[in-house]
């Protein structure tokens, strides 16, 4: 595997210096020697999670919080944020998800081996909405879980990531049983940065190109506006060998094996294209004790992976109805209500020239009979994927009163949408009229949250510090939508009674009966007490 990367920091550059840097990059690519433009890490890192006291450092926090700085992401070879975190946080796990249905589009990530929706994800301390995909093939950990889509955020937009594992549920509720990850966006009011990264594992395998930029600027004299953008494309990888059944069919005389001589079934990372991510973070001091904040993100990407190979002799519901003893022969007249006239055809044990091959040729010549071997003589492997879009906006006002009461009023809204697509497959129940590409439908997750938070230090003589009393209220609306797909993707066709499968093979579409909107409202209150018993 090889990777090349370059980072340009134009915080203090003039135009001639910036042009010179870009020209130098155009002339030569050097091996990746990443360096940080963030400067030395602060000795006292202020944390947001794990405590509700104002401006506590990581050393003073009562809960163990890990800090991953933004500069740490520059040193990673991957272009995907989840893969970067996997190398930096030992208890964070995410797979490449080959052949995993909808989980191919939004990969489920988890902490400490618990389901993804047991991990609370925050951005700038505010709850992030969940992804639209419910993982049905999650490796035994994420099955049935619905976690946040972390890949929708660009790594260049991050100032740091705070990770809290122990005691998170006691402070933040059952959503945080596995822990909390707080993604803190950059807040510089000047300068910027450009990152360019490219590479591949081997020729034609896993090629990646990524360009990202960040710029900070003043927002009046008392604020900042920081923007980040990333554009990326990643080719699919293949760690496959030829399936033994596909090779046996080819050796037996079937020269139409799907994708031959390449593996009939690909096992590897999916292709990710048109991957666009954008983040904005804005802050403004309204006065000495009050500030306004606004931040959000938008992202979209297309993902294309594969499914398992459909053997042309024994695949149920398509090529056979009895495990491969006989071929599944469709009878047009029977589908119309007449008597069946098409014969039973055994699957050949040898190659071309057998008696059953002769019978198969006769079926192909009979307009009343059909087999899907005519459409896919060497079998087929469906290509599955779709497009994912994600956006979120949060805004609020925080500050303090003359009496020392801290407050934070905020509102946020976020949506994640997955539109599915499958091709190189068919709906067996539709017979020879079946299309080979389908839009099975969509999942949409929408969440709206309103928070009111207060905290105040109360002097208590028996403690080494003030007793911090925090309390608050949250209201959250959650809405999950299933959008119906193409009629052909879920339709029960006239050949169903003859043993042919229903719906687009591999990923059946969502019918109008399955489509709908499900929502609920959540109310929560909390009280939090914190003090230093000793110095």
Question: Which residues fall in each region the model found?
Answer:
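Short acidic/polar hinge/loop motifs at secondary-structure boundaries
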Residues: 126-165
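Extracytoplasmic beta-strand/coil segments of soluble accessory domains associated
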Residues: 86-132
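Transmembrane beta-barrel wall of Gram-negative outer-membrane proteins
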Residues: 203-378, 382-400
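Short, polar/charged loop or turn motifs at beta-strand boundaries
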Residues: 45, 63-86, 108-114, 145-151, ...
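N-terminal periplasmic "start-of-domain" segments of outer-membrane beta-barrel proteins
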Residues: 45-76, 103, 132-143, 192
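N-terminal periplasmic accessory domains that precede
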Residues: 81-84, 88, 107-109, 122, ...
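Outer-membrane beta-barrel transmembrane strands
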Residues: 114, 209, 266-307, 377-422, ...
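Surface-exposed loop/turn segments flanking beta-strands in extracellular/periplasmic regions
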Residues: 246-258, 314-327, 363-370, 422, ...
